[in-house]
Amino acid sequence: MKIIRAKDYQDMSRKAANIISAQVIMKPNCVLGLATGGTPVGTYAQLVDWYNKGDLDFSEVTTVNLDEYRGLPKEHPQSYWYFMNENLFSKVNIDPAKTNLPDGTNLDTAAECARYNGIIHKLGGIDLQLLGIGPNGHIGFNEPGEAFELETHCIDLAPTTIEANKRFFDGNEALVPKQAYTMGIKTIMQARKVLVVANGKAKAQAVKDAVTGPVTPACPGSILQLHPDCILVADEEALSLL
């Protein structure tokens, strides 16, 4: 795993956006795996800025997102489709038909997982997968204890993840969905390049465990030690325990 140090969140975002930009420029019809949450917001903002300056063209890019809450329609302001539309899709020239997320309204779990796996396989896999890492080491919604060999599946969210996400639901834990569709570790590991972004002291232990700890389902991010082309871009606080 290659580690790129950033001074702060803004620097982390710019460095991560540089790597994504290089992928888009080198292969205009690439498949980007995208992530949601607070960490990549700045990365998307930087990509939008470069697009507005004429430096990037997303017209041939296809995207597949890591995950989506089960039970939320895409129009819900806390759905991950809504997040992606607000932060990236509506602000660049990407073809909406080439943006893919799990369908949170499809409650037929087996059918939805098969559909999403089929999309990724038909695309020939993912060229670059962007990831955040949770305080408990989760990547996507692959929580501690998840088997490494899974593809897209439905997962019960860990209490720590529900707690972390309630800030997006007016602090009301009862409103936070308890399940999500997520790409599995197997799918993530099959991406040709993986880019992990992390910032802040709250992520320091997870980063330490993912980078230097044993490879174990107890810290899902630790599997990335075995990926042949994984880059971690993190600020000083997130790297403070290394």
Model regions and ranges:
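Class I SAM-dependent methyltransferase SAM-binding "motif I" and its flanking Rossmann-like core
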Residues: 140-185
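Short beta-strand segments
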Residues: 33-37, 65, 102-103, 130-133, ...
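Ligand-binding beta-strand-loop-alpha-helix segment within the catalytic cores
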Residues: 56-129
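A glycine- and small-aliphatic-rich helix-loop capping segment at beta-alpha/alpha-beta transitions
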Residues: 46-57, 80, 144-153, 215
